[in-house]
């Protein structure tokens, strides 16, 4: 769930649930989110009902969230498996972000500063995967997940 505007080719309900800031704040106040955070004026969060429904169906749930959100999840689900995706370097991360051509210069700089702060918190995660090669990182993540099944 997010309050940011959809990017080109993103579909509501598939990529994210796009909502207004008022709707998001109502979800926070009602305790409907398992985690949430704010970045550059936009809110991002995960509805509890979405996660609970999947878990009750016996499914595993994969969340792509930032460090504070992951900490909130672990507080609520202590046996959650956490994996920190470590970029090869901040220079490479910058190259990747700029390559998307979806962010202003200000947001690129904010993303890099946030990444530098988050990289220092990798020890909060059960696993760290170095994301220098997509295929290798994907295989390593799959192996970690298989070890818990």
Indicate residue ranges for each PLM-predicted region.
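NTP-dependent small-molecule kinase module
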Residues: 79, 95, 99-103, 117-149
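A short acidic, helix-capping loop that chelates divalent metal ions and anchors anionic groups
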Residues: 5-11, 92-95, 101
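Conserved nucleotide-binding/hydrolysis micro-motifs of P-loop NTPases
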Residues: 2-6, 67-69, 87-92, 134-135
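ATP-dependent small-molecule kinase phosphotransfer cores
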Residues: 2-61, 68
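Conserved phosphate-donor/acceptor-positioning beta-strand/loop module used by diverse small-molecule
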Residues: 61-66, 75-99
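Conserved catalytic network of the ASCE P-loop NTPase/AAA+ motor domain
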Residues: 8-9, 53-56, 74-78, 120-122
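Residue-level signature of catalytic and energy-coupling elements of molecular machines
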Residues: 24, 62, 115, 129
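Glycine-rich S-adenosyl-L-methionine
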Residues: 105-113
């Amino acid at each position: 769930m997010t309050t940011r505007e959809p990017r080109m080719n993103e579909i509501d309900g598939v990529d994210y649930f796009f909502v207004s800031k008022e709707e998001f704040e109502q979800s926070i106040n009602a305790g409907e989110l398992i985690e949430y955070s704010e970045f550059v004026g936009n809110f991002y969060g995960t509805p509890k009902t979405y996660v609970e429904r999947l878990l009750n169906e016996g499914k595993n749930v994969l969340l792509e969230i930032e460090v504070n959100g992951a900490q909130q999840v672990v507080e609520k689900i202590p046996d959650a498996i956490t994996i920190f995706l470590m970029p090869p370097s901040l220079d490479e991360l910058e190259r990747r972000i700029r390559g998307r051509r979806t962010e202003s210069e200000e947001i690129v700089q904010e993303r890099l500063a946030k990444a530098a702060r988050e990289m220092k918190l990798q020890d909060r995660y059960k696993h760290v995967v170095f994301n220098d090669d997509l295929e290798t990182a994907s295989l390593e993540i799959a192996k970690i997940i298989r070890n818990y099944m």
